[in-house]
């Protein structure tokens, strides 16, 4: 399982546009083979900071999303006019713990 962590700080005047783009792209994710889930968060301590956490079956699924033309257009707009800063981290999940079993599962 792959986690993609997108951390960004939107320029104050463009934060609403980011949220609009994110809402427009979200339905397209369901069409990507290997997409599992996505959640978006807004920092309580850093004004304008947002985080998007998405889960994918494997790196190939992440590549398919990265190649989506609508996603590419949104990325270009984000780089050009929305974000003052962004960082993307891609991580492989090696283990999962749950409160239900108290045990971990190697993934």
Where are the model-predicted features located?
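Short S/T/G/P-rich N-terminal loop/turn motif that feeds into the first structured element of a domain
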Residues: 1-50, 57-67, 83-107
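Conserved short loop/helix modules at catalytic or binding sites
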Residues: 74, 78
């Amino acid at each position: 399982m792959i986690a993609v962590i997108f951390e960004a700080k939107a320029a104050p005047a463009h934060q609403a546009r980011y949220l609009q783009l994110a809402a427009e792209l979200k339905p397209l994710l369901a069409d990507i083979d290997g997409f599992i889930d996505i959640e978006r968060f807004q920092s309580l301590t850093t004004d304008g900071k947002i985080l998007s956490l998405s889960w994918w079956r494997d790196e190939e699924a992440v590549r398919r999303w990265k190649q989506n033309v609508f996603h590419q257009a949104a990325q270009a707009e984000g780089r050009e006019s929305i974000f003052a800063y962004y960082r993307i981290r891609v991580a492989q999940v090696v283990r999962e713990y749950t409160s239900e079993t108290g045990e971990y599962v190697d993934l």
